[in-house]
């Protein structure tokens, strides 16, 4: 937990520290608490510090992104490994969305591996808390109550929809994605 929170705070300036988040998180835990609740507690602890220093919004968003990626991918993935995780996940995500009748079958005609390779995982670090929470609550696709979409996949999905009728669909989708994300 300490390491996860330290990573979320890294690069955000000297005033954004992991220790207050860890301390508040630990205060709200009890014996036998499930890991999902531990992660939620860390998000809530970080969120309370946004008023003190607005840069905590980025640390909070990074903690939220971790819980979203765990929900979508079904496992912990370090941010450094998210580029490959996106490549591996993206074709299956489109297929799952089509199978659930949430996405148009025409999206399966794209070169999904090429589009997955174009996703920029480091852009997930640019979200503030409110922006990422809004995407999660309102826009990310879900099957039942489980989200199946990650932020960069969301932007690429929108880009694919915009480029359905283009001659070089993949190139145009990547161009649109670059603008959107």
What is each model feature region?
Residues 1-181:
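Extended catalytic cores of very large enzyme megasubunits
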């Amino acid at each position: 937990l300490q390491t996860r929170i330290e990573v979320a705070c890294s690069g955000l300036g000297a005033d954004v520290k992991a220790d207050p988040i860890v301390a508040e998180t630990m205060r709200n835990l009890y014996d036998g608490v499930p890991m999902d609740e531990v992660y939620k507690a860390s998000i809530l602890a970080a969120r309370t510090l946004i008023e003190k220093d607005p840069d905590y919004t980025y640390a909070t968003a990074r903690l939220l992104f971790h819980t979203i990626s765990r929900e979508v991918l079904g496992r912990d993935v370090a941010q450094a490994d998210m580029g490959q995780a996106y490549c591996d996940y993206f074709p299956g995500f489109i297929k799952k969305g089509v199978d659930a009748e949430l996405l148009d079958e025409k999206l399966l005609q794209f070169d999904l591996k090429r589009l997955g390779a174009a996703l920029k995982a480091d852009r997930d670090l640019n979200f503030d808390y409110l922006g990422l929470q809004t995407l999660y609550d309102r826009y990310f696709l879900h099957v039942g109550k489980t989200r199946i979409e990650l932020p960069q996949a969301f932007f690429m999905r929108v880009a694919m929809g915009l480029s359905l009728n283009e001659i070089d669909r993949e190139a145009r989708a990547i161009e649109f994605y670059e603008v959107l994300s």
